[in-house]
């Protein structure tokens, strides 16, 4: 498929408001993609690589601006790109306004597509893969050169969507649900079969190709693969009354203040994945050793990595973040902060045939299998199954006395649904719920804080899942050291500045507390946080897993009850 054809479909989709029409257009795109279907299924969502892939593009805004300005000719520099971006707020619109192939500088907005259409979808994918592979001395220059080469071949429309793609901001209103429904519509397979295949594979391209080439039976035959991560099942806030009214009895567990970890062990290799499916094996060698010595393969285990002191008591969440994703000085940090595995679910376990998927088994059965594959019982969560609210309260009190965060309430009969934040897992905390929000802007501080960012604009994911809506600003709860560290963290993601105001690429997620959620016309979400306060940087989250407007609306509604 020509990249220009993909860009035309993207433009048509972007101009469409109705959800059903979007799905129909995406289905038409998939039907026309031919051998490029796997790539197109990712590109349309703004993804270059499969969600489970360890390959990352690692292109910041400044690198993109440099490549764009070089393709636009000697009369345009990166500052010109930033200035134009400050006016439009859309890197795609800026890229589309440049006369790239002609090397003649800034063109009028809405410029035509006069250049020869030579780019293909597969060619773009190959060049971006080469860009991602660039490493070591001179890699940044190599990335600029490769990206310049792509932009230099682009028409205006192609540049619009290529620029968005490389920065992960496709912004055409296509979320995961639309892609799922489009696969079903394009290849005449049940939506439920597509959903199930996506849950076990986490690969939209693979599922799309399987649906097209082999149909429903092949989708139904897809299963978990040890070594390939799946999305974690998630919990929503709830009460003991909610649980007992809905399920009649609840499985109660301690809620650990740690980082989610998914353990894959095939008998030879142990691989650990974060909640975002990032490989964190190298950062947690003691967990690897524990699994090798105490777990029967093949297995996929869901659990929590928890930092502990010398007595085995839990340390605050911030301590585990000092270990998570660490690539240097791992041995030294291990001496300072030890990490323990607290396993609470089993997705795949040994069987007579080699291995068995357990996603459809009830939680009570999965937990029983978990106990059978982990020799060290202390590493497996304690579960109380009861219909007695007083017993649950006593269990919660014990968990809190032990320094833990609270309790989890789970439906004993529920299957494991990857990526789903449903009503079968409820988290009960003694404190008001916090929100995990994306930093999309900031303001420079004043006085002694004039050299650092002092106020941060917060956004939640929109309903489509590929954009963000503002919900408030936070400046409370950060020390001078935290402000400096957060400013350094955000600096590579700055897109433009206008006086005290800074526009920031969505990249960093903050956990934010608040007193109340109020309706407000001040922010694009229609809501504002009353007395927001910084709690922590969510190192284990990305913008795609931050909280949604839907969750904000639900929490706001709960306040009124």
UniProtKB/Swiss-Prot annotation:
PROSITE patterns: DNA_LIGASE_A1 (PS00697), DNA_LIGASE_A3 (PS50160). ATP binds at residues 253, 260, 275, 304, 344, 421, 427. One of its GO terms (biological process) is cell division. One of its GO terms (molecular function) is DNA binding. Its EC number is 6.5.1.1. It is an enzyme of class 6 (ligase). Its cofactor is Mg(2+). CDD domains: Adenylation_DNA_ligase_Arch_LigB, OBF_DNA_ligase_Arch_LigB. InterPro entries: ATP-dep_DNA_ligase (IPR050191), DNA_ligae_ATP-dep_bac/arc (IPR022865), DNA_ligase_ATP-dep (IPR000977), DNA_ligase_ATP-dep_C (IPR012309), DNA_ligase_ATP-dep_cent (IPR012310), DNA_ligase_ATP-dep_CS (IPR016059), DNA_ligase_ATP-dep_N (IPR012308), DNA_ligase_N_sf (IPR036599). Keywords: ATP-binding, Cell cycle, Cell division, DNA damage, DNA recombination, DNA repair, DNA replication, Ligase, Magnesium, Metal-binding, Nucleotide-binding. The active site is at residue 255. It catalyses: ATP + (deoxyribonucleotide)n-3'-hydroxyl + 5'-phospho-(deoxyribonucleotide)m = (deoxyribonucleotide)n+m + AMP + diphosphate. DNA ligase that seals nicks in double-stranded DNA during DNA replication, DNA recombination and DNA repair. NCBIfam families: dnl1, LigA_Halo. Belongs to the ATP-dependent DNA ligase family. This is DNA ligase. It comes from Halobacterium salinarum (strain ATCC 700922 / JCM 11081 / NRC-1) (Halobacterium halobium).
